[in-house]
Amino acid sequence: MEKKGKLELTWVGKYEEEKLEPRILIEDKSKSYGDPNTENMLIHGDNLLALKALEDKYTGKVKCIYIDPPYNTGEAFDEYDDNVEHSIWLQLMKQRMEILNKLLADDGTIFVQLNDEELCYCRVLMDEVFGRNNFINMIAVKTKNSSGASGG
């Protein structure tokens, strides 16, 4: 008997789920700006907890998501540590991607900005979470000229 399976990325701790309690966003009207009748919002805080807070009201309703996760370059910044073991980085991303998938509308699009360090792992993870057939394209941005390039 042939067993059917799927392609997936595995890492230490992948199936250890952290239980997140529902969260409530509290508006700070003193920081509001512009038309008060729009539904736009800026959320300041831990992004995992903020995403969890959005689940109740916005599941299946978000048309466009843009994320710029840590590149895991090995650097240490004041705001965050960009030097974590790859399995930890993948687990952090998996938790967020699963919530983003719930928030995304059927006709929605997600854009992820990464460098080469974790790009391929993120792509396989996203194939697993969003479905490989939902991938549209990868956009490469030239950030500097290669050695010997004319630049033209």
Positions of predicted regions on the chain:
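Short secondary-structure boundary/capping segments
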Residues: 59, 79-84, 125-131, 152
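DnaQ-like (DEDDh/DEDDy) 3′-5′ exonuclease domain used for proofreading
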Residues: 1-66, 73-87, 92-95
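Short, flexible loop/turn elements at secondary-structure junctions
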Residues: 47-49, 71, 116-118, 142-145
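Short, solvent-exposed loop/turn and secondary-structure capping segments
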Residues: 74-80, 122-124, 138, 150
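A generic structural micro-environment signature
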Residues: 17, 86, 120, 145-147
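Class I S-adenosyl-L-methionine
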Residues: 136-152
